[in-house]
């Protein structure tokens, strides 16, 4: 009959003092090696984080600066002629057309509690400068209680083949607004909507001024406009309001229109 002997497990799994020391030494080497490998990785991650943080901050700030979603009184100077308004003077950094030299710098006053609106890239002319075939929007400002204003620019060649034509070269005020009317209303233009026209001279520059009642316009039931031509561009300044806005802010809106000039 076969017999089985039991061998103490402590002897099988026992580790000699020399082996134990060797294992500990190897463990220290492995740990040290792992730490050395991790250190460059940590440094790399820290460097990436240092670069990424300012970028994230810029992304958070960009929408505010791009849309200027603050009241214009917080960053525009007071108008010298009337301190109840602030003065907006367009600079080359403001629009693609100004940077390209297609539009001469312009200016107008605004109440200090108005805000600048963001303009979609496709409407800003950014994609077609310096030679745009279609009109584009330069800048736009708004106050929900008073109304909105926008500067629209159109290539002169849409209205005449004469280089450097003046606004007078384009015809009488009624003829010019017939071409530019849809850019005032946002949809269509009917000559019956035109209430009044006038001609203004500021220095060497002539402006056509319009008062329109536009019940079906997308921009509002009341529109004021001022048009002039210089270089290769016709510039149209539009002041729009709903019936409620017009009733409370007519004089303010008229003052804004009168202030516009190249």
Curated annotation (Swiss-Prot):
One of its GO terms (molecular function) is calcium ion binding. GO terms for biological process: photosynthesis. Keywords: Chloroplast, Disulfide bond, Plastid, Thylakoid, Transit peptide. SUPFAM superfamilies: Mog1p/PsbP-like (SSF55724). InterPro entries: Mog1/PsbP_a/b/a-sand (IPR016123), PsbP_C (IPR002683). Disulfide bonds join 128-132. Pfam families: PsbP (PF01789). GO terms for cellular component: chloroplast; chloroplast stroma; chloroplast thylakoid; chloroplast thylakoid lumen; cytosol; extrinsic component of membrane; photosystem II oxygen evolving complex; thylakoid. It is found in: Plastid, Chloroplast thylakoid lumen. May be involved in the redox regulation of photosystem II. Belongs to the PsbP family. This is PsbP domain-containing protein 6, chloroplastic. It comes from Arabidopsis thaliana (Mouse-ear cress). The gene is PPD6.
């Amino acid at each position: 009959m076969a017999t089985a002997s039991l061998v103490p497990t402590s002897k099988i799994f026992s580790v000699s003092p020399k082996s134990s020391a060797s294992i500990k030494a190897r463990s220290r080497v492995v740990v040290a090696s792992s730490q050395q490998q991790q250190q460059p990785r940590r440094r790399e991650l820290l460097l990436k984080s240092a670069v990424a943080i300012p970028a994230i901050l810029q992304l958070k700030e960009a929408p505010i600066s791009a849309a200027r979603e603050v009241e214009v009184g917080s960053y525009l100077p007071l108008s010298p002629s009337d301190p109840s308004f602030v003065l907006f003077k367009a600079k080359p950094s403001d629009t693609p057309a100004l940077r390209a030299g297609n539009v001469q710098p312009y200016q107008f006053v605004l109440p200090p509690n108005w805000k600048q609106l963001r303009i979609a890239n496709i409407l800003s002319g950014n994609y077609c400068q310096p030679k745009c075939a279609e009109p584009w929007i330069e800048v736009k400002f708004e106050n929900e209680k008073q109304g909105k204003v926008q500067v629209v620019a159109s290539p002169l060649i849409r209205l005449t083949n004469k280089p450097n034509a003046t606004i007078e070269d384009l015809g009488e005020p009624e003829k010019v607004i017939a071409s530019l009317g849809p850019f005032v209303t946002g949809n269509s233009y009917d000559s019956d909507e035109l209430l009044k026209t006038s001609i203004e001279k500021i220095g060497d520059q002539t402006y056509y001024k319009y008062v329109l009642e536009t019940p079906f316009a997308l921009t509002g039931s009341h529109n004021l406009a001022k048009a002039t031509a210089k270089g290769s561009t016709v510039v149209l300044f539009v002041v729009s309001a709903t019936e409620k806005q017009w009733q409370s802010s007519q004089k303010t809106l008229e003052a804004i229109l009168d202030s516009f000039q190249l």
